[in-house]
Amino acid sequence: MTLKMKNILFISGMLILFLLLWSVTLFADVPKGFTGYGETTAISPDDETLVFSYYHDGDASLYAVPVDGGEATLLAQPEEGTSYVNPAFSPDGDMIVFIKQWQEEEQPYGELMLMGAASGEKRALTSGYNLITEVVFSPDGGSLYFLQAGVFQNYSDIARERPHDFDIHRMDLHTNETEQITNKEAYDMSSLAVTPDGEELMYRSYEDSDRIIFMSMENNRETSPVPIFDVASEAPILSSPALSPDGEQVIFSDVASKDENGTFIYEGFRMDLDNYEAEQITNFQEHVTEPVFFHHSDRLIVTVDKQFAQRESDYQYWEVSLDGTEQRRLHIEIPEGKEL
């Protein structure tokens, strides 16, 4: 076997492994009875509040806590067998949009929900049996952009069933009218974001390789920046990219090293969109994912999985300075009084 073929097989195997592990957390696919933090968080526009999901016996409720940690407040608790996940704030901080997830006959579903940040009043924005996975506000707060999958299946005998045939949709919040703005039926889409000027969408996609894509709202033209950095996995993974509030940087997670068992260790990397140069900014020696920017300071919240590649994740939330010199764990008290 030639060296080139060995490299191709190694890279292909690595990407398949990543997709298998990624599918474990996608769409609230958590072990039955799981209790603990969800993977994603949202920071309010005034940088005062962190909203997150917390699972009780497999069902996720939404909580809010000061960004420095402390006692959490229950925002929304779903009915049994349902989870509230992937929250996002409106630009003025008055509203929170999130995904309501559930399963029927092993088929997952996801619908859009909107809630008043202060009142807690919530309403469904979509109905039926859709497969919506992520949602973000437009910069003016008048629209939502969301990812919707067309099928839930496996395209390989060794892969788990998961959402495929993705496209991006837009909802006008004044009329509730929805339009599909891409026609890709993509194998994978995630990490949806809107540039500050509202002229482009950013998302992560996987077809033949992992890519961060910027798509023009005017003509659907796409650009795909390739970060310049030393990656330990032979080929970039570019997991969970997050766009900075000024639109000038992207933080993403990628393989930095391996542990003694050969498991990939994912750290946070910062890419400058002017020159695509990237540098590692975390050193947890764990699995770092889902970075979220503060709006008015050079800080991030990242999620660290202490049990990556195991049956159950053990997520913690950490505050990290943008230059990577400081990091601090958020200690949160869930209303039952137990600090986790």
Q: Which sequence ranges carry the predicted segments?
A:
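Sequence signature of WD/YWTD-type beta-propeller architectures
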Residues: 2-340
